[in-house]
Amino acid sequence: MISPRMTTNLLPARTISLVSNGGAATASPSSPSVAARPRRPSSGTGRGKVSAITLDDYLPMRSTEVKNRTSTDDITSLRLITAVKTPYLPDGRFDLEAYDSLINMQIEGGAEGVIVGGTTGEGHLMSWDEHIMLIGHTVNCFGSRIKVIGNTGSNSTREAVHATEQGFAVGMHAALHINPYYGKTSTEGMISHFESVLPMGPTIIYNVPSRSAQDIPPEVIVAISGYINMAGVKECIGHERIKHYADKGITIWSGNDDECHDSRWKYGATGVISVTSNLVPGLMHSLMYKGENAVLKEKLLPLMKWLFCQPNPIALNTALAQLGVARPVFRLPYVPLPLEKRAEFVRIVEAIGRENFVGQKETRVLDDDDFVLISRY
């Protein structure tokens, strides 16, 4: 039997006559080659009967209703987007109470959007069920107060399409998409990958070669910039690339906290997608909204450099635990910063002012035994 799933939506419906002769099935000359199970010969004749199989078009499991009524302009206007941390319970499950508190503190501090399940939020350590659940939870609880941008990208186009369909189905306002990593593709392959997800809703493209091991060249961004759902680019290459896109009218967010002030005020960036704003959302809001401020920039630089002394989100996880706003639980392979770096963070908080950081508890240096490392969850 031939399953309709063997066809694609590029093939018209057709009738193919399969004639069994001595148990051997052959397709009619006008039909494409079709693999079919041979029919058993009819009793007493040695010849099978002619059978007709109708192959219907492949029908995608999609609704024609609009799933996302967020306009791209609603996304391109955002100045401060936080790549939010995902906190855990001691058994490794999501700590939704702590997560909700973090989101509320982002809203109160002036963040206009959050990336859910990004690198900072450890989406790569989640199952897709966890990932989509957290996006849906964020939308249901906070979607009227802050834009929810789900990281539904993947190095597999099939996975990216499926996750993005699910993300928009549960209400996310926009999607974040990285280029295919590890199993890298060509420039044309990148364009095709992004074109597969752009029709679904507002989309931010994420260029971070230090993680993906492949730069998204400007010709890829220019090629897809005409799509109505192309919201812009989170760019980690640096100021010159940001200026290149800004000069072309393409919305661009800095992906480097230590460069975001100059990117915003000197090179044309719309704003920043930030890690640092997990800790000091109010100060990051000022950095993006209140004009050039070299004093504030220099004040925050030690914190920004500390946050990236080891691969993100190791330092952020350590910091939030020491501030008392998240449990000191790490999903492996992440482990906390060494003791001297933990002590350095306390000094940085004192220099900037505890009142500028999230949470109300006194900052303290945690001991090694305070941390819980989870390998099964």
From Swiss-Prot:
GO biological process: diaminopimelate biosynthetic process; lysine biosynthetic process via diaminopimelate
Gene3D superfamilies linked to this entry: Aldolase class I (3.20.20.70)
Active site: 206, 234
Region listing for Disordered, in residue ranges: 21-50
Pfam families: DHDPS (PF00701)
EC number(s) stated in the UniProt entry for this protein: 4.3.3.7
SUPFAM superfamilies assigned to the protein according to its UniProt record, in alphabetical order: Aldolase
Catalytic activity, reaction form: L-aspartate 4-semialdehyde + pyruvate = (2S,4S)-4-hydroxy-2,3,4,5-tetrahydrodipicolinate + H2O + H(+)
Enzyme's top EC category: lyase
UniProt-listed SMART domains: DHDPS (SM01130)
Name of the molecule in the record: 4-hydroxy-tetrahydrodipicolinate synthase, chloroplastic
Pathway linked to the protein: Amino-acid biosynthesis; L-lysine biosynthesis via DAP pathway; (S)-tetrahydrodipicolinate from L-aspartate: step 3/4
Protein family (similarity comment): Belongs to the DapA family.
Regions that span the bilayer: none
Segment annotated as transit peptide: 1-51
Taxonomic path: Eukaryota, Viridiplantae, Streptophyta, Embryophyta, Tracheophyta
Main location: plastid
Listed CDD domains: DHDPS
NCBIfam families given in the database record: dapA
Subcellular location(s) per record: Plastid, Chloroplast
Keywords of this entry: Amino-acid biosynthesis, Chloroplast, Diaminopimelate biosynthesis, Lyase, Lysine biosynthesis, Plastid, Schiff base, Transit peptide
Positions marked as site (Part of a proton relay during catalysis): 119, 182
Residues that, per the record, bind pyruvate: 120, 273
Gene responsible for this protein: DAPA
InterPro entries, alphabetized: Aldolase_TIM, DapA, DapA-like, Schiff_base-form_aldolases_AS, Schiff_base-form_aldolases_CS
